Regions:
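Short gly/ser/thr-rich secondary-structure transition/capping motifs
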Residues: 2-9
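Left-handed beta-helix
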Residues: 9-10, 15-16, 21-22, 27-28, ...
Length: 63
């Protein structure tokens, strides 16, 4: 995961210790909580909340 080749909208919140995979897009007003891991090439839509320590695989779309 350590790549910074992803997009996070300015209105989204990332807590400490999150992993974001390459090519992932996180859109408006989303919140990624501490310890969450998001795989590569994912799309997290508006207002998505990913709780603490949740793991999301590759190529997942959440709206």
């Amino acid at each position: 995961m350590g790549s910074t080749n992803y997009f996070i909208h300015d209105t989204s919140i990332l807590d400490k210790n999150v992993g974001i995979g390459r090519g992932t897009k996180i859109w408006h007003f989303s919140h990624i909580q501490s310890g969450a891991i998001i795989g590569e090439n994912c799309s997290l839509g508006q207002n998505v909340n990913v709780a603490n320590n949740v793991k999301i695989g590759h190529h997942v779309k959440i709206q």
